[in-house]
Amino acid sequence: MRLIVVSGQSGAGKSVALRVLEDLGYYCVDNLPVSLLTAFIQSVQGSQQNVAVSIDIRNLPKEPSLVQDVLDQLKQNNDVSMLFLDASKETLLKRYSETRRIHPLSLSQSKPSLAQAIELEKQLLGPLKEQADLLLDSSNQSLHELSETVRMRIEGRERKDLVMVFQSFGFKYGLPTDADYVFDVRFLPNPHWEPDLRPLTGLDAPIKSFLEGHSEVMELKQQIQKFFEYWLPMLEKNNRSYLTIAIGCTGGKHRSVYLTQQLGEYFAQLGHQVQIRHTSLEKQQS
């Protein structure tokens, strides 16, 4: 039997992840006390159905090491993994403002502000985050995008396929927190300084023509392709379920978007499971 523990910050998308897992055939339980987890797993052992359980700030034991002890015990007879959903403080503040929901820690006796509650929860969940097998940052993702990301990561893990996530970003918005590899392409020729090209993105044909007219752009693309072609077999043997490759330029609009799209399409054509995201572009268009 397979058990996925879903954890993460309040407002980061745990309920979305549980709905996706339910659609994938998992028996999902929200807010189950950790002390009851072993007994619950034993009770459903005979059904042969995969199970997903959420552990978060609502049911976190006072002693964080208890979670690891319980999971270590369950791993002896089950395939156990943890999915942790995270999001930036700014994203969480915006989501709570839009939904007008109350943060779980805001109900405590100290009655912290929303910003304080988010920061405190981050500290309390730190040990769980360190144990995560799958770490997803839902910042700047819509419900549909997050659902698709969770589905691809879970399905890829079940098939033992490595999911390659190609992600463009702008350095002025900050580094992505979930990247395994980061390529800084700010040294490449910048279409931003061409007035006719400035409003366009790396997905538009004139930007492609501009960048493909520079040999250094094509050489860098080929070198990144060769790097991952060479090392992918080793990464796949390392029991990884996904690999996040982030490519950044200044604003995340032209150079990084072009290279991310090209690399993602290249590896998809080779038969790999690929997901392409343009995080800063999505932020600019929202």
From Swiss-Prot:
One of its GO terms (molecular function) is ATP binding. It comes from the Bacteria. ATP binds at G8, Q9, S10, G11, A12, G13, K14, S15. InterPro entries: P-loop_NTPase, RapZ-like, RapZ-like_N, RapZ_C. Keywords: ATP-binding, GTP-binding, Nucleotide-binding. Displays ATPase and GTPase activities. Belongs to the RapZ-like family. This is Nucleotide-binding protein VC0395_A2112/VC395_2645. It comes from Vibrio cholerae serotype O1 (strain ATCC 39541 / Classical Ogawa 395 / O395).
